């Protein structure tokens, strides 16, 4: 049920905070990281029919993020952490979900973006030992995705060549050869089916610079798990807002609010005023 809305998740996290059995309640993230994770979940709901931002929905988004942030002490990660944004590094797509804190029992809740189907396998493998469950986080009843395009663009007027390029880009071979969740259905099914095969892969790691080593054994996915993942991916309908100017404004102002540097009303007014002015200029 916590995955049905940000408020339900915040309620659940505050309840879990009463049990002090783990170092943190939520996977440690900087304010910017929390704001971006939930921006990707909720921003699709903000734009009204007239093209302006809905102040009430922006206010609720900020309120729920701050509730989650305030549950834990973030002084360590804020002092040395770097803002980790879902994106590209050396040509490789990565997400913001880190299943290792649950595996090492240093937190009770983790969330973030899934970059490829192998992230599902890691998440399921990490949750095997403690019975953790996962769900698609949505707000307003519709789950969202973070669109990503990796392509070469050439100027010119060759329409046939352009069509052939797009066809190749969206084809099974291109989807299978790159990191990320492919839009090609055949490529996606092949990637999921591959994770049902036998695997003996393991990964050793430590946390927070300690000498203690952990080893996680990757396990094969079951048919039921594979079917569930495919159904979840196929059910995604809307993308998060993709305009970087809007995203940057929200994250910048939201960080000041989450850290207690300005109040909610000031933050909402600053975001809606600047974003609505920007949107009006784009029309």
Predicted regions and their residues:
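Non-transmembrane alpha-helical segments in soluble domains
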Residues: 10-17, 36, 62-69, 162-171, ...
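Short helices/loops that flank or line small-molecule/ion binding pockets
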Residues: 11-15, 80-111, 115, 252, ...
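A ligand-binding cleft/hinge motif common to bilobed small-molecule-binding domains
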Residues: 103, 112-129
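Bilobed periplasmic-binding protein-like "clamshell/Venus-flytrap" ligand-binding domains
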Residues: 17-29, 174-185, 277-283
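Conserved C-terminal helix/tail region of periplasmic/extracytoplasmic solute-binding proteins
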Residues: 203-283
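Extracytoplasmic/periplasmic substrate-recognition and gating elements
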Residues: 123-194
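Extracytoplasmic/periplasmic solute-binding protein
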Residues: 5-53, 57-59, 105
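Glycine-centered hinge/linker elements that transmit conformational signals in sensory
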Residues: 13, 48-93
